[in-house]
Amino acid sequence: ALVQLGQKDLLIDCQGNWGNILTGDGAAAPRYIEARLSKFALEVVFNPKTTNWKPSYDGRNREPITLPIKFPLLLAQGVEGIAVGLASKILPHNFNELIDACIAHLKHEDFVLYPDFPTGGMIDVSKYCDGMRGGNVKIRAKIEKDNNNRALKITEIPFGRTTSSLIDSIITVSYTHLRA
């Protein structure tokens, strides 16, 4: 869980090999990685002015009772999981766009908010349904022509894919078309 939070670059300051979401490389063993809460996390999530605290189990430290977060962190980070038979998938969103949407909401203004992915890519939101159940998005790699139009350069990959899985799918498609 800590590695996944650390790879999202918002709550955890990381040091060591935390893996790579682009290549799918895993993180090093826990003894080789270090983590601390980021300044953002200390201000927005663990702020002593907005968080209620209680003594820890042995009374030497304090721990938060609840985490009243001043920012829609769930939308920024995104989440996917299942518990007690209920599946959930919330796509990540752009930090700055979330701030603008929060301000618009507080001013009772309309706003539009679409998912934004850390790996980039081109997104089709024509069937998004404003994030409601049944909606979906399609994400494609961003490809540019290079070397006098003789080569293709993939500059952004779809969210949830790794470079190796993208290469494998390109090889599979190319073999299929070469045989035809």
Regions found by a protein language model. Give the residues of each.
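Catalytic phosphate-handling regions of large nucleic-acid enzymes and associated NTPases
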Residues: 1-136
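Residues in well-ordered beta-strands of folded domains
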Residues: 19, 140-144, 155
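Gly-rich Lys/Arg/Thr-decorated short loops/hinges at beta-loop-alpha junctions or inter-strand turns
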Residues: 49-53, 147-152
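Flexible glycine-/small-residue-rich
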Residues: 86-88, 143, 156-159
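Fungal transcription factor middle regulatory core
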Residues: 133-144, 150
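Long hydrophobic segments that form regular secondary structure
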Residues: 151, 155-175
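Conserved small/polar residues in nucleotide/adenosyl-binding loops
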Residues: 176-180
